[in-house]
Amino acid sequence: MKEFFTYLFSENTSNLQIGLFDIWHFTYLGIIFGGTLLLSLLLQKKSASAKEKTLRIFAYLVIGFYVGDFFIMPLSDSYSGISAYKLPFNICTIMAVMVPFVQFNPKFTGIKTSVIVLSIASSLMWMCYPGTALGGQPPFCYLIFQTFMYHGFLFCWGVLNLSYGAVKLDIRKIWKEFVGILCILVWAWFGNSIYDKGYNWFFIETSIFPFLSDEIMPLMVVLSVFGVCLVVYGAYYGIRRLCTQKLPCSV
């Protein structure tokens, strides 16, 4: 039985390879963006309970894909056992922990908007530029499939929250996202300090760009994520204005 699952999650089941900005990369992006848009449009006129149920399902998928990964990693030859790198010290994995809290517990309503925006921003950044994460593996091996689907569910959950009107963005409160990014920075620094394995969580220890020094990476990471948050806000206001002029929608 173990041999079957090892084969199922093996990288060696295909001669195909996925690379940055190739047809397979764009295929995953098309599926995720297209599916998100479709769900947004299909449920736009549905009841509030139907929308809430959909958001709950995606919250379950986010945490399910994250936690389930720790059980499946030992069966995949993408990993040599359970990888500590998947612990919640990166912004995307931290969001996996935060999503259930803000979705299911009213006590966390105060940070729900920030978690939604950071979920969209972080997943969008990874999906559009996963960098060396697409290291020539087969496009449908476990490592690639799980990582894209996890980020896709995280992105979809965030976008649908905005589309269904679960929260409304206010640019005057974007400082909360900035504070959230700083908190994640401190948390990632703590993780990098206690796990001296070179994991480079949140990319704050070692530069991932040859033209930037290691010392400047914490600042660049904060500015980059906050910049994408500004893009999310800009898209939100732009789409809302378009909807107000042409189509009735919840955004």
Segments (PLM) and residue ranges:
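Membrane-proximal helix-loop-helix units in multi-pass membrane proteins
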Residues: F101-L162
